């Protein structure tokens, strides 16, 4: 066991040791170690997770006859229920795409999609800042891959030109809203690029955009009117939609390939029907949350200006606002200071972010008030 203890001690010496906190949730507040704090670290972007009215309306429609609390099996065996198909049809209809497929989580989706859709003769070109789940999916794909500089589409174009005719297919992989910097990919440029090269497909993860952007809350692809141009559009229900699970919208052929070849889908017990029913309930109402989206954007613009004034660094265009401090010790100290002031802020350190860019990842939600965010800015 000594080798494992040494690993932990080394993490501690580098200020990279992590632990699971004991938390009590009270709406937009969190209590930790008897300290009640405004939660500045949540992905509950629309503030729906603690909405009692929504929860009550959902439960009332069933009376006491709730959907099952377990699927007990993979969907490909006995674990499929009508509500799964209902949700897939609703998602496909809203996106005006041929098909949609559900997954147990965003990590689950990103882990399994690329290995299912590539061969040893394929190529993956991924943005340098894509999420860890996408990196793990790339590693499992066992095909050639390269990472283009973050949002550098000239670099991506050079890689595409360099590899023309060398591979059976090429996947361009990106997030739309990047989870640590809060900046946004230029999906229009990516669509134009993929159209210039044969057998090239675009895979976009909208985990931090679904619910928050677009007229109907369908993400950056909807905002930019590009839904039909993206081969694989992936999103999660576990953030703005206050539920669990994930989806991909695509054509029917890709859906059938995933059903037949995606190991995390084939070999996992499906989500409980109860949770899928809650997701359906929320997703059905997604267009109704325009006031929440508008309020969130106002809060976000204010906080971005405040942080930029202090750090001179502001990559974000969204409700994810990075307060970049540099070293691990600085990020840990600032997080502790803000928690003492009543704000639940967490340090983000390597390897989650590049070395010397440790930060507080500030994440706003639509149930916060303008006064709360203004008071927080004073503490910065």
From Swiss-Prot:
EC numbers: 2.3.1.47
Pfam hit, one: Aminotran_1_2
Gene Ontology MF terms: 8-amino-7-oxononanoate synthase activity; pyridoxal phosphate binding
Binding site for substrate: 18, 131, 352
InterPro entries hit by this protein: Aminotrans_II_pyridoxalP_BS, Aminotransferase_I/II_large, AON_synthase_class-II, AONS_Archaea/Proteobacteria, PyrdxlP-dep_Trfase, PyrdxlP-dep_Trfase_major, PyrdxlP-dep_Trfase_small
GO biological process: one example: biotin biosynthetic process
Record: residues binding pyridoxal 5'-phosphate: 106-107, 179, 205-208, 236-239
Reactions catalysed according to its record: 6-carboxyhexanoyl-[ACP] + L-alanine + H(+) = (8S)-8-amino-7-oxononanoate + holo-[ACP] + CO2
PANTHER family linked: 8-AMINO-7-OXONONANOATE SYNTHASE (PTHR13693:SF100), CLASS II AMINOTRANSFERASE/8-AMINO-7-OXONONANOATE SYNTHASE (PTHR13693)
Free-text function comment from the UniProt entry: Catalyzes the decarboxylative condensation of pimeloyl-[acyl-carrier protein] and L-alanine to produce 8-amino-7-oxononanoate (AON), [acyl-carrier protein], and carbon dioxide.
Name assigned to this protein: Putative 8-amino-7-oxononanoate synthase
């Amino acid at each position: 066991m000594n080798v494992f203890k040494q690993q932990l001690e080394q993490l501690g010496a580098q200020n990279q040791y992590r632990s699971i906190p004991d938390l009590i949730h009270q709406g937009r507040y969190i209590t930790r170690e008897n300290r009640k704090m405004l939660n500045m670290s949540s992905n509950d972007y629309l503030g729906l997770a603690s909405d009692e009215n929504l929860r009550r309306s959902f439960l009332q429609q069933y009376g006491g006859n709730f959907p099952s609390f377990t699927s007990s099996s993979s969907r490909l065996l006995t674990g499929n229920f009508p509500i799964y198909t209902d949700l897939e049809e609703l998602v496909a209809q809203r996106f005006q795409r041929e098909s949609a497929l559900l997954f147990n989580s965003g990590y689950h989706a990103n882990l399994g999609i690329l290995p299912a859709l590539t061969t040893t003769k394929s190529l993956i070109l991924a943005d340098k800042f894509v999420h860890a789940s996408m990196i793990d999916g790339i590693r499992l794909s066992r095909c050639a891959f390269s990472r283009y500089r973050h949002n550098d589409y000239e670099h991506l174009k050079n890689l595409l030109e360099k590899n023309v005719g060398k591979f059976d297919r090429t996947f361009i992989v990106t997030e739309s809203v990047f989870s640590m910097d809060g900046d946004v990919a230029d999906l229009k440029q990516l669509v134009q690029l993929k159209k210039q090269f044969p057998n090239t497909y675009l895979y976009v993860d909208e985990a931090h955009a679904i619910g928050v952007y677009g007229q109907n809350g369908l993400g950056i692809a909807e905002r930019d009117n590009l839904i039909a141009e993206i081969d694989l559009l992936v999103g999660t229900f576990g953030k703005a939609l206050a539920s669990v699970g994930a989806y991909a919208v695509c054509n029917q052929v890709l859906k059938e390939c995933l059903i037949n070849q995606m190991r995390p889908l084939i070999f996992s017990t499906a989500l409980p029907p109860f949770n899928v029913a809650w997701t359906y309930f929320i997703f059905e109402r997604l267009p109704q949350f325009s006031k929440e989206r508008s309020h969130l954007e106002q809060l976000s613009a204010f906080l971005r200006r405040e942080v930029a004034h202090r750090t001179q660094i502001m990559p974000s265009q969204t409700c994810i606002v990075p307060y970049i401090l540099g070293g691990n010790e600085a990020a840990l100290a600032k997080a502790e200071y803000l928690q003492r002031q009543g704000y639940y802020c967490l340090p983000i350190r390597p390897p989650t972010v590049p070395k010397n860019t440790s930060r507080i990842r500030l994440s706003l939600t639509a149930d916060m008030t303008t006064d709360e965010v203004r008071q927080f800015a004073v503490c910065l």
